[in-house]
């Protein structure tokens, strides 16, 4: 490495500006489609989180209709959601990796990239600002016109104004280079499939040609809202544990004028100048009602034996629990002073927990989902840690040992599925019935399962015959209610479908068969940031196979009954053709004039195909 070589740091927005292919903005065709996706998904997520039946309107207009593609378009998306607080609008749309979707709960978005990347792409291809209109109360609307400072990863507000409106919601409009002649079919498919998997939403799309595509809601009930949960022990790594440990440490509060005012207020001292002993008596009486920072200050006072005035002239340098020493800097004497701490003191435990953090069992019970005291004790024995081992005293090697044990301990309960919001069998069935109008339709929702500590649920539906126009198996893939239209060849769902021996289920040739697959999870294992295909994790693949097996058996039963019905109809047609001739021949042969009553044999009740 050359000594003259220079080093620089770039911002997240600069990185994705240079590598925008990673987020799905590789060319005008893909970029227009990806921008549509990101804005619609943001609107649907916002409505879902607040329990609002979504009404989303999108329009794409060419800036110069006569110009050939690729050319500039204006993409606008408007919703009836809760809007975004005015103070958050610039950062939400002008900062890469800023958002509200980083918690452990199900949402369409997960990287904090999409909408901002669309804005960044629009800016670098047209140099035109973004226009955002947001109202949270349905009375006042904030309108921003802004750009993104790519090098600093910060918004640049060009204009901000407010006006009165009649309803809440969010509207976003950007200008970007796109190729609708190539992307149009994908965009229309995306809107169509989004309506299929979101039957409780109304979605309207006005395309550049003036055509309108409108899909109204078919159900008025929404899936239950997902909740944010604590992580599962099987889904963590050393870095996650390290960050958790930082959260368990409580900083020694600075004893400045503001802290002394806080202490006086909580102790009810007002401006009284009490002696050290009187202050400590008050502390004992009010201990349970004090906040942790105030408790820590009072614990320090107990060992330093100072009043407020003297305490404000010191800075704590070190709390050495192992040697039971408290060291502070005395500004009045300009020297460092150490005092002994009595381990039997009432206040010693307060400082010990501040410095050393929680015990292992307390840490497990408070920081992870579905881990109670009994399970925590079992784990401590399994991992060969003492239950009272303080987390803050662990070495790096012990942290690695703890992480490995958490991932391999089998007695933890399965992940909590309350963070998931599957669509539900009934809404999925109604959505498929509206779009496909099949002869046979079956849906299934599997129970919650998990991969690497992240819960997931598989929903799947099969439709056959009727008005299904496709010949051959057509698969619609969804993840957290996002249609996946690209890169299907490397997706786990296609792998499962292609590995199925359909002849076992009486499906042959190129059948009019549709499969709808929906994976919902707090962490979809996408292969790329573009969110187009799902990795073949063994646990997910297994659940997909079981769901498909269940539905395939029902389809096989339907096909058997249909085959029997068709065979009966063929027999009836055959009898209708030959029995009259046989009756006539037998009558002549017997020398009779009247033919036997054979019509009853071929005019029985019609056979009705049974629908499942």
Model-predicted regions and their roles:
Residues 151-155, 178-200, 209-251, 362, ...:
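Charged regulatory segments coupled to nucleotide-binding catalytic modules in large multidomain enzymes
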Residues 313-346:
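Conserved tyrosine-mediated DNA breakage-rejoining catalytic core shared by Y-recombinases
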Residues 83-85:
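A short glycine-centered beta->alpha linker in the GHKL/HATPase_c
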Residues 1-53, 87-94, 224-225, 229-235:
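Bergerat-fold GHKL ATPase/HATPase_c domain
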Residues 79:
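Acidic ATP/Mg2+-coordinating residue in the GHKL
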Residues 73-74, 99-235, 332-340, 350, ...:
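GHKL-type ATPase core
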Residues 40-76:
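ATP-lid-like helix-loop hinge signature
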Residues 252-272, 277, 312, 362-381:
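Helix-hairpin-helix
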């Amino acid at each position: 490495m050359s000594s003259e070589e220079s080093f620089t740091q770039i911002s997240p927005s600069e990185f994705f500006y240079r590598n925008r292919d990673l987020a799905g903005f590789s060319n005008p065709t893909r970029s227009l489609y990806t921008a549509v996706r990101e804005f619609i998904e943001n609107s649907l997520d916002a409505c879902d989180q607040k329990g609002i039946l979504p009404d989303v309107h999108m329009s794409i207009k060419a800036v110069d209709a006569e110009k050939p593609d690729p050319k500039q378009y204006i993409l606008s998306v408007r919703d009836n959601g809760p809007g975004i607080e005015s103070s958050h609008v610039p950062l939400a749309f002008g900062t890469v990796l800023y958002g509200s979707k980083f918690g452990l709960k199900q949402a369409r978005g997960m990287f904090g990239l999409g909408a901002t990347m669309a804005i960044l792409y629009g800016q670098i291809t047209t140099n035109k600002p973004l226009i955002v209109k947001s109202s949270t109360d349905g009375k006042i609307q904030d309108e921003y016109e802004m750009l993104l400072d790519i090098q600093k990863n910060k918004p640049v507000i060009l204009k901000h104004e407010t006006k009165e409106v009649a309803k809440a919601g969010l509207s976003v409009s950007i200008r970007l280079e796109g190729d609708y002649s190539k992307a149009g079919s994908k965009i229309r498919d995306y809107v169509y499939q989004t309506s299929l998997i979101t039957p409780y939403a109304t979605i309207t799309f006005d395309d550049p040609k003036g055509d309108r595509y409108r899909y109204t809601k078919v159900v008025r009930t929404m899936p239950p809202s997902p909740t944010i949960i604590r992580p599962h022990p099987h889904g963590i790594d050393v870095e996650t544990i390290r960050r958790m440990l930082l959260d368990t440490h409580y900083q020694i509060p600075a004893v400045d004028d503001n802290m002394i005012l806080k202490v006086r207020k909580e102790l009810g001292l007002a401006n009284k100048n009490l002696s050290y002993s009187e202050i400590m008596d008050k502390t004992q009486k009010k201990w349970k009602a004090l906040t942790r920072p105030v408790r820590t200050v009072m614990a320090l006072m107990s060992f330093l034996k100072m009043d407020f005035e003297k305490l404000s002239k010191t800075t704590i340098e070190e709390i050495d629990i192992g040697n039971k020493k408290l060291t502070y800097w005395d500004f009045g004497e300009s020297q460092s002073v150490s005092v002994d701490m009595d381990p039997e003191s009432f206040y010693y435990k307060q400082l010990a927990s501040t410095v050393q953090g929680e015990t292992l069992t307390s840490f497990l019970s408070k920081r992870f989902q579905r881990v109670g005291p009994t399970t925590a004790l079992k784990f401590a024995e399994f991992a060969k840690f003492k239950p009272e081992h303080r987390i803050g005293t662990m070495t790096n090697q012990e942290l690695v040992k703890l992480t490995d044990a958490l991932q391999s301990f089998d007695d933890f309960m399965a992940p909590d599925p309350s963070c998931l919001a599957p669509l539900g069998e009934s809404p999925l069935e109604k959505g498929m019935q509206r779009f496909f109008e099949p002869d046979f339709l079956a849906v299934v929702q599997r129970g919650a399962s998990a991969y690497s500590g992240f819960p997931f649920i598989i929903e799947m539906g099969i439709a056959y015959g009727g008005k299904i126009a496709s010949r051959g198996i057509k698969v619609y893939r969804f993840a957290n209610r996002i249609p996946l239209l690209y890169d299907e060849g490397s997706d786990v769902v296609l792998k499962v479908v292609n590995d199925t021996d359909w002849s076992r289920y009486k499906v042959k040739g190129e059948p009019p068969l549709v499969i709808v697959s929906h994976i919902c999870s707090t962490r979809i294992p996408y292969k790329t940031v573009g969110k187009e295909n799902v990795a073949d994790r063994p646990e997910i693949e297994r659940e997909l196979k079981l769901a498909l097996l269940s539905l395939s058996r029902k389809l096989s039963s339907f096909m058997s009954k249909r085959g029997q019905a068709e065979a009966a109809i063929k027999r009836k047609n055959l009898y209708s053709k030959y029995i009259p001739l046989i009756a006539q021949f037998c009558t002549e042969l017997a020398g009779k004039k009247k033919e036997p009553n054979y019509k009853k044999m071929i005019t029985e009740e019609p056979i009705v195909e049974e629908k499942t």
